[in-house]
């Protein structure tokens, strides 16, 4: 009689552990899905920044070669506008670098979460309730 109670308790404890592990996997999966959505948004932002940076870099490259020493006042104006373009270029390139760094961090975090999920799935076997 005592043996059957102990065996029943052990089975219940195993079921509880399994359910807790499944709950952990579901929580990690939810976190992974949210991170993947954020990653896709950041990726779209990164693509947009890349296009903008390419345009601005080309514009800045052409602006730095347009100086003419024949008219001093125009040269000063050109230099000021070039400085402005270069600062804008620098800002966009910084944003792009930050976005790329953020994407890299997100990829690493997603890989860690996926590894945790895989590890937890090894511990438990999902059984269809039929």
Where are each of the predicted segments found?
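Leucine-rich amphipathic alpha-helices with coiled-coil/heptad-repeat character
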Residues: 39, 46, 53, 60, ...
